[in-house]
């Protein structure tokens, strides 16, 4: 006589509870379509309807690279050693050249091995810095108006956004008196961007020194997003050149 097999733990197929539907992570619930993506679609619709929209939004070059640049890229692409994986921190020659560039234009000495990280774009940098410094609920100071990525990445990592106003009557610079009156408890990071997008306002050594002093006073990381330093600017400036070190301790301000 055939023995009856014991029932499998968990019951039969008919009695197993239904597996819940897979849902996205909570961190993406507040993520919206990127600002410029929405605007470019809007511009495309306007152009299709006959409007001639002049796009002053994204800082995309409207001129091609120089012939010498294109030739150098073609020569590099033809080399057999340029098509594999690169080091995760960039090749040493590239980082060393970045360090020489900072010394030449800003008078800043940087350690290529520990203070330079090549990235594929500013968004990657904003994400890396936010992930490195911001826990859920930490405060981050974001300029208004300002680069939309600061806010979108801050929302993604669950940070608490504290906008600070840039006003024309103040030359589009932070109002430090207003900042000092804010509740800065829990604030760990402050984004600034000069030459500024979207106002076009330029920075100054005096402004950067105020930002450095503000960051040190409140133990806030100041991150200077500096992609427009050489656009219509006779005196390119980096916040790193304004650091006044009082000891050989590690750098206490993050910038570019």
Question: Each predicted region: which residue ranges?
Answer:
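A short helix-loop-beta submotif of the ANL/AMP-binding
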Residues: 156-161
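Aromatic/hydrophobic pocket-lining residues that form π-stacking "cages" and hydrophobic walls in ligand
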Residues: 39, 43, 150, 211, ...
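Short acidic capping loops at alpha-helix termini that bridge into adjacent secondary structure
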Residues: 109-116, 136-139, 186, 247
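Conserved PLP-anchoring active-site segment centered on the Schiff-base-forming lysine
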Residues: 132-154
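Active-site phosphate-binding strand-loop segment of PLP-dependent enzymes
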Residues: 162, 166-234
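N-terminal small-domain helix-loop-helix segment of the aminotransferase-like
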Residues: 6-8, 13-25, 29-121, 128
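Single conserved hydrophobic/aromatic residue that forms the stacking wall/gate
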Residues: 245-256
């Amino acid at each position: 006589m055939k023995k009856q097999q014991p029932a499998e733990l968990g019951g039969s197929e008919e009695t197993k509870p239904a597996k819940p539907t897979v849902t996205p992570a909570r961190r993406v619930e507040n993520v919206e379509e990127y600002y410029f993506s929405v605007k470019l679609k809007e511009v495309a619709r306007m152009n299709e309807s006959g409007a001639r929209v002049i796009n002053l939004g994204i800082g995309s070059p409207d001129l091609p690279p120089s012939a010498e640049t294109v030739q150098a890229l073609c020569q590099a692409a033809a080399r057999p050693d340029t098509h594999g994986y690169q080091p995760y921190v960039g090749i040493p020659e590239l980082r060393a050249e970045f360090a020489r560039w900072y010394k030449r234009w800003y008078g800043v000495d940087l350690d290529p091995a520990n203070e330079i990280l090549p990235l594929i774009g500013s968004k990657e940098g904003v994400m890396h810095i936010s992930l490195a410094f911001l826990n859920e609920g930490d405060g981050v100071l974001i300029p208004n108006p300002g680069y939309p990525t600061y806010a979108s990445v801050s929302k993604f990592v669950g940070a608490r956004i504290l906008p600070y106003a840039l006003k024309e009557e103040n030359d589009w610079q932070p109002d430090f008196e207003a900042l000092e009156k804010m509740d800065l408890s829990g604030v760990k990071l402050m984004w600034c961007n000069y030459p500024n997008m979207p106002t076009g306002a330029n920075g100054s050594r005096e402004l950067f020194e105020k930002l450095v002093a503000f960051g040190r006073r409140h133990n806030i990381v100041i991150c200077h997003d500096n992609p427009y330093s050489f656009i219509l600017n006779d005196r390119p400036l980096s916040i790193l050149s304004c650091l006044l070190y009082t000891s050989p301790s590690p750098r206490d301000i993050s910038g570019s």
